[in-house]
Amino acid sequence: MIEADRIISASPKREEEVIDRAIRPKLLADYVGQPSVREQMEIFIKAAKLRDEALDHLLIFGPPGLGKTTLANIVANEMGVNIRTTSGPVLEKAGDLAAMLTNLEPYDVLFIDEIHRLSPAIEEVLYPAMEDYQLDIMIGEGPAARSIKLDLPPFTLVGATTRAGSLTSPLRDRFGIVQRLEFYSVDDLTSIVKRSADCLNLNLSPDGAYEVARRSRGTPRIANRLLRRVRDYADVRNNGVITSDIAKQALAMLDVDSEGFDFMDIKLLQAIVERFDGGPVGLDNLAAAIGEERDTIEDVLEPYLIQQGFLQRTPRGRIATSRTYAHLGIAKLD
């Protein structure tokens, strides 16, 4: 199964973009969670405005779905400037980047998502732009080619990535501010779900919000997606009223359990416990047992299970923890 097809996938879905923009917080005052990031950014933005300067270049990293794009837009809104948005894979030629840079107004924000996927040629153009607000471009071809420098207005580059370790050192070192986004607590996600429900004019009880939040794997994007599907269920089965019981019924219908696991997570855990006596089991054997690719298990299924303490990676293989046995309702043999 493709990761993006799972309802608990943190990957963005194109059809969700319009609604996501409508419920996305616009200012730091509306931004829930990430208290350290919020406090730091409030100070940095106020200081830049007091000095009438562009905000330092900002790198935001962390798992998908935690609000990197949201934070980039908040920075632009708080600074009172425009934001231009692109992504690493889209910037194929130096001219593409040059066109964006030369159209910036003073203090504008240039947001590059998936910045770890920039080509080396694009990075070379970025270095002087970030450091000196200058653009080095080549005019002409062959022996007649010459380099000219163009002055750029002061601007803020905001880069977002799920793989900070994949950035080259020269690029990473040019960011004056680096922020890591962490998974959200259930309390913070409950607040996010309530806010989204208000934006969408939903009839949502506090207990209903909690049931959605606790299954959202620490990720606002998943929380908002589950809320929309629960809304569909409530519209058909309960006149649009989302109670705790309605939320539980809707999420059970979607095969999302109390831990936010779907059938793929459960299939993996059951295989380790029931077919391999809890492990250790090698990755190849596990992949064959559940009919999934090695990469899918390693990159998609395992990270959240490990982070929540349901699975251990060891040199000898994967091992199910006591939490797995308790969750599956299976007695652990000594």
Curated annotation (Swiss-Prot):
Residues 4-184 are annotated as: Large ATPase domain (RuvB-L). InterPro entries: AAA+_ATPase (IPR003593), AAA_lid_4 (IPR041445), DNA_helicase_Holl-junc_RuvB (IPR004605), P-loop_NTPase (IPR027417), RuvB-like_N (IPR008824), RuvB_C (IPR008823), WH-like_DNA-bd_sf (IPR036388), WH_DNA-bd_sf (IPR036390). It is found in: Cytoplasm. DNA binds at residues 294, 313, 318. Its EC number is 3.6.4.-. Pfam families: AAA_lid_4, RuvB_C, RuvB_N. Residues 258-334 are annotated as: Head domain (RuvB-H). Homohexamer. Forms an RuvA(8)-RuvB(12)-Holliday junction (HJ) complex. HJ DNA is sandwiched between 2 RuvA tetramers; dsDNA enters through RuvA and exits via RuvB. An RuvB hexamer assembles on each DNA strand where it exits the tetramer. Each RuvB hexamer is contacted by two RuvA subunits (via domain III) on 2 adjacent RuvB subunits; this complex drives branch migration. In the full resolvosome a probable DNA-RuvA(4)-RuvB(12)-RuvC(2) complex forms which resolves the HJ. Belongs to the RuvB family. This is Holliday junction branch migration complex subunit RuvB. It comes from Actinobacillus pleuropneumoniae serotype 5b (strain L20). The gene is ruvB.
